[in-house]
């Protein structure tokens, strides 16, 4: 505090007296409440800054505590939007099921209830918006979309606080909670090297290569610049025959002793070209839950679900609605899991 500056805390009521409006109006304007006009919100925020107003963090914490303890219906529900053509398919993936479980448990812990809404011919985005608005559901969670994207039309995102899981949800460009895929790639490579593997290859699909591949390539560079195996990208345009052909050619040319992949059917693909796991080649995956191998990364999916709920509740508490100008990404580090598809290499110390 500058010498001569008053030590008295500036309050909401002080700002209200200066502007000749009610303290309720000032409070709402400072919270970006859309019931207050943009011009007045801007004026209140400008004057409050000039007067040296700072929110009392203890009062804010008390307010959030009271809101969490209240049995009133306001803010009592959060929406989980399932857009999959076959709705049960979403949670058939163990990763995504744990997203739901973590989110559901965290919502209950915080005094909310998480409800699933399935989009279909009857539950259109327009109808969904009316239901959410009528029930005062202010928070939306968007789980992974798979291969399809939703045509949201004129959905009014500015009325809702929204968080998406991962990068398959392209629209809306809301805040994101997901696994730290670059870190997971590096964790995987380092642990494969720890187990004695020296010729570690990466096999991926185009949409996943950049995310997981960066950590893998950095790990490869750190380990030994003289051993470089280019990642094999199995493009969507390949038919089954082409996939097996390019896989076999890559294996013959680079002779990896272990493979890191995000393709769940990789073990079966290797078997079909005559490579047994783990006898001929070790195998690790980016998801030990859905990846088709028991060695690799546990993405801590339940924690991702919890974090998504914490983020959306924070947005509600701060009245931050709509598609943000600056998107925040909350990344959860995975952990390595040893497994039988990637046994320790005998005599690795000599390698």
Question: Model-predicted segments: where are they?
Answer:
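Bacterial carbohydrate/catabolite-sensing allosteric modules
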Residues: 1-4, 14-18, 49-51, 56-57, ...
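Generic, well-ordered alpha-helical segments
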Residues: 36, 70-73, 95
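Extracytoplasmic/periplasmic substrate-binding proteins
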Residues: 92
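Charged, helix-prone or intrinsically disordered regulatory segments positioned adjacent to compact structured domains
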Residues: 67-76, 80
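N-terminal helix-turn-helix DNA-binding module of bacterial transcription factors
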Residues: 1-67
């Amino acid at each position: 505090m500058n010498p001569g500056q008053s030590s008295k805390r500036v309050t909401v009521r002080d700002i209200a007296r200066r502007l000749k409006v009610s303290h309720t109006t000032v409070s709402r304007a400072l919270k970006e409440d859309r019931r207050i006009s943009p011009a007045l919100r801007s004026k209140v925020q400008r004057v409050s800054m000039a007067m040296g107003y700072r929110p009392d963090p203890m009062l804010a914490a008390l307010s959030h505590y009271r809101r969490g303890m209240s049995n009133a219906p306001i803010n009592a529900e959060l929406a989980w939007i399932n857009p999959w053509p076959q709705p049960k398919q979403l949670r058939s993936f163990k990763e995504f099921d744990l997203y739901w479980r973590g989110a559901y448990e965290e919502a209950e812990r915080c005094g909310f209830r998480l409800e699933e809404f399935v989009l279909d011919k009857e539950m259109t985005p327009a109808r969904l918006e009316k239901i959410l608005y009528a029930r005062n559901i202010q928070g939306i969670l968007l789980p992974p979309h798979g291969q399809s994207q939703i045509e949201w039309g004129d959905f009014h995102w500015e009325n809702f606080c929204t968080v998406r899981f991962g990068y398959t949800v392209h629209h809306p460009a809301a805040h994101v909670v997901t696994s730290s895929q670059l870190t997971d790639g590096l964790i995987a490579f380092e642990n494969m090297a720890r187990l004695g593997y020296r010729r570690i290859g990466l096999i991926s699909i185009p949409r996943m290569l950049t995310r997981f591949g960066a950590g893998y390539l950095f790990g490869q560079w750190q380990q030994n610049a003289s051993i470089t195996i280019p990642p094999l990208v199995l493009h969507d345009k390949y038919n089954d025959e082409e996939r097996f052909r390019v896989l076999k050619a890559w294996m013959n040319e680079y002779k990896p002793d272990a493979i890191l992949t995000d393709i769940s059917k990789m073990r079966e693909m290797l078997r079909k070209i005559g490579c047994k796991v783990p006898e001929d080649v070790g195998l690790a995956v980016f998801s030990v839950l859905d990846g088709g191998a028991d060695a690799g990364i546990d993405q801590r999916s339940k924690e991702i679900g919890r974090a998504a709920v914490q983020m959306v509740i924070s947005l509600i508490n701060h009245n931050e609605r709509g598609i943000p100008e600056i998107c925040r990404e909350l990344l959860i580090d995975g952990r390595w899991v040893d497994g039988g598809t990637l046994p320790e290499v005998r005599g690795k110390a000599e390698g």
